[in-house]
């Protein structure tokens, strides 16, 4: 046998051994993992839930409205994916507890949390933001991801570890004019990610962050629904198109997989080349 052929055979054999030893295949990098995804019946959250399920995970989707949960579950189950769902308002302790309990009851534990829920209730000067708006924004966008993580950690520990992905925003690095509380809350998530990564590493739980740029969703529609405004936004990007939810989904799946087993405390920007460093 030629040397090149022998080397190729050895490489393929080693790859097969490595993949077999990890108990997964490249087609199912999240096989038998159990994933919770908050705010996952539309947009980025829905795309993430779909991708995790496509990659082999049992996914529990959630949203504040039962009809949205039912529709998302029906759609994804119709694609042959292992998906269930429950109502969850992440700002309510009883809802967070129910989300965790649902996953444990149906699938026996939790391996993955994707914290995607967020609000943006204000547009205007930071000098005009009321205390009520600050409280609502920070409660949902910062406090809830921290408490949601706290709720899943005991279940992850029972399974030997896990992965948390917190969804921030490009606004954490490049604040959007008029969205003051939202900008601040998303910057805070970078610090939350690093803090959790340090504290949870001894428990074999990795914590990373996704910072989407301008992604075409209903949440961001005021930034792109006008064609002229959309074209103007594209001019600020290195990649001259708006992002799609699916552009974020594969990154999250990677961060939750064994391929990212040596990555924690990091933020991945999916922003089409938008400047993204503090």
Curated annotation (Swiss-Prot):
Residues modified as N6-acetyllysine: 92, 105, 216
Reactions catalysed: a secondary alcohol + NADP(+) = a ketone + NADPH + H(+); 3beta-hydroxy-5beta-pregnane-20-one + NADP(+) = 5beta-pregnan-3,20-dione + NADPH + H(+); 5beta-dihydrotestosterone + NADPH + H(+) = 5beta-androstane-3beta,17beta-diol + NADP(+); 5beta-androstane-3,17-dione + NADPH + H(+) = 3beta-hydroxy-5beta-androstane-17-one + NADP(+)
Positions bearing the site annotation: Responsible for the stereoselective reduction of 3-ketosteroids into 3beta-hydroxysteroids and benzil into R-benzoin: 176, 179
Gene Ontology BP annotations: alcohol metabolic process; ketone metabolic process; positive regulation of reactive oxygen species metabolic process; retinal metabolic process; steroid metabolic process
Classification via InterPro entries: NAD(P)-bd_dom_sf, Sc_DH/Rdtase_CS, SDR_fam
Cross-referenced SUPFAM superfamilies: NAD(P)-binding Rossmann-fold domains (SSF51735)
Domain of life: Eukaryota
EC number from the UniProt entry: 1.1.1.184
Binding site for NADP(+): 36-60, 186
Record keywords, A-Z: Acetylation, NADP, Nucleus, Oxidoreductase, Peroxisome, Phosphoprotein
Enzyme class: oxidoreductase
Phosphoserine, modified sites: 220
Record motif Peroxisomal targeting signal, residues: 276-278
Known outcome of mutating residue 179 to L: Decreased reduction activity for isatin and increased activity for 5beta-Pregnane-3,20-dione, 5beta-Dihydrotestosterone, benzil and retinal
Gene Ontology MF term list: 3-beta-hydroxy-5-beta-steroid dehydrogenase (NADP+) activity; 3-beta-hydroxysteroid 3-dehydrogenase (NADP+) activity; alcohol dehydrogenase [NAD(P)+] activity; all-trans-retinol dehydrogenase (NADP+) activity; carbonyl reductase (NADPH) activity; identical protein binding; oxidoreductase activity, acting on NAD(P)H, quinone or similar compound as acceptor
Signal peptide as annotated in the record: none
Residues that hold substrate according to the record: 169
Cross-referenced Pfam families: adh_short_C2
Coiled coil segments of this chain: none
Additional notes on this entry: Primate DHRS4s display different stereoselectivity and catalytic efficiency in the oxidoreduction of some substrates as compared to other mammal DHRS4s due to a difference in conserved amino acid residues. Three homologous proteins DHRS4, DHRS4L1, and DHRS4L2 are derived from gene duplication of DHRS4, and the gene cluster is arranged in tandem in chromosome 14.
Role: NADPH-dependent oxidoreductase which catalyzes the reduction of a variety of compounds bearing carbonyl groups including ketosteroids, alpha-dicarbonyl compounds, aldehydes, aromatic ketones and quinones. Reduces 3-ketosteroids and benzil into 3beta-hydroxysteroids and R-benzoin, respectively, in contrast to the stereoselectivity of non-primate DHRS4s which produce 3alpha-hydroxysteroids and S-benzoin. Diplays low activity toward all-trans-retinal and no activity toward 9-cis-retinal as compared to non-primate mammals.
Similarity comment: Belongs to the short-chain dehydrogenases/reductases (SDR) family.
Subunit structure: Homotetramer.
Annotated domain remarks: The C-terminus peroxisomal targeting signal tripeptide is important for peroxisomal import. Once in the peroxisome, it is involved in intersubunit interactions.
Name of the molecule in the record: Dehydrogenase/reductase SDR family member 4
Organism lineage: Eukaryota, Metazoa, Chordata, Craniata, Vertebrata
Gene: DHRS4
